[in-house]
Amino acid sequence: MTKNQTWVTEFILLGFPLSLRIQMLLSGLFSLLYVFTLLGNGAILGLIWLDSRLHTPMYFFLSHLAIIDISYASNNVPKMLTNLGLNKRKTISFVPCTMQTFLYMAFAHTECLILVMMSYDRYMAICHPLQYSVIMRWGVCTVLAVTSWACGSLLALVHVVLILRLPFCGPHEINHFFCEILSVLKLACADTWLNQVVIFAASVFILVGPLCLVLVSYSRILAAILRIQSGEGRRKAFSTCSSHLCMVGLFFGSAIVMYMAPKSRHPEEQQKVLSLFYSLFNPMLNPLIYSLRNAEVKGALKRVLWKQRSK
């Protein structure tokens, strides 16, 4: 970088301000959780692929959610694990940082929309069972999934384009363990008003709007479940819907606290903890929630294991 050129070409990720020993312990713990995330979501994908009884719209959307969780964790966690326990400067170049921000936003937006599609699928299955097979055809499910990915990626691209128009001339220390968009914007040498407005508008469109749709869907689903005469049918419907509601609560709850709730005295540390939920804990917990609370997934696992033993 020459004397007359002050543009930042790389950033320093400050990560967690902890002692080296604690960072090494966290590195081991987070590595273990990351492996569980890959194995759990990989197992969900494998079961859906191998068991024909899971070839339904609900598990089609669940497979997309598993792909998002694997991608989400793989975008943020490896860099964090590399930096944990290092005494030297933890740098990341501008282009990889921008790419990490794009992928982070794309996966987050897409997961919001996929969760809405899953709630719509449950609404049709429980409230309109006679029309379910006609409306939720494979072609329709594919269009809904592709639309979710396209909208999520397009919104993320808008955020990145608005970041690229900003000058970064120092400081160059990101108080985070990855290139989270709010932390990156704090380093800009120009007014970020437009970026903040777009982030707020996107939060309303991609967070508040979908959450309202999910809540409306489940209010009608709950009313329909309570009208079911069969105790077994009621338990099965509650089991499937409660798994999805747990996932919705984890994802939207942490997102609302992070982007829309009043900031604490230590907003940077709050963002780091909440980002851990996004990047590591939520992706790890989603397959556990579905495997422990969903009878169909547990049944599929038993059938797959039985086939392997019979060979």
From Swiss-Prot:
Pfam families from the xrefs? 7tm_4
Question: What is the first-listed, main subcellular location in coarse terms?
Answer: membrane
UniProt entry tagged with the keyword Plastid:
no
- State the UniProt keywords alphabetically: Cell membrane, Disulfide bond, G-protein coupled receptor, Glycoprotein, Membrane, Olfaction, Receptor, Sensory transduction, Transducer, Transmembrane, Transmembrane helix
Question: Which Gene Ontology terms of cellular component type are present?
Answer: plasma membrane
Q: So which domain of life are we looking at? A: Eukaryota
Parts of the chain on the Extracellular side: 1-24, 79-100, 159-196, 260-272
The reply to whether Disulfide bond figures as a keyword in the UniProt entry is: yes
Transmembrane region positions? 25-48, 57-78, 101-120, 140-158, 197-219, 237-259, 273-292
The residues on the Cytoplasmic side of the membrane are 49-56, 121-139, 220-236, 293-311
Q: Which residues are glycosylated?
A: 4
Molecular function (GO) terms for this protein are: G protein-coupled receptor activity; olfactory receptor activity
- Gene Ontology process terms (BP): detection of chemical stimulus involved in sensory perception of smell
Q: Which Cys residues form disulphide pairs?
A: 97-189
Q: Which InterPro entries match?
A: GPCR_Rhodpsn, GPCR_Rhodpsn_7TM, Olfact_rcpt
Q: Where found, per UniProt? A: Cell membrane
Q: How does it sit in the membrane?
A: Multi-pass membrane protein
Known function = Odorant receptor.
Q: Which family does it belong to?
A: Belongs to the G-protein coupled receptor 1 family.
What name appears for this protein in its UniProt entry?
Answer: Olfactory receptor 2A5
Source species, please? Homo sapiens (Human)
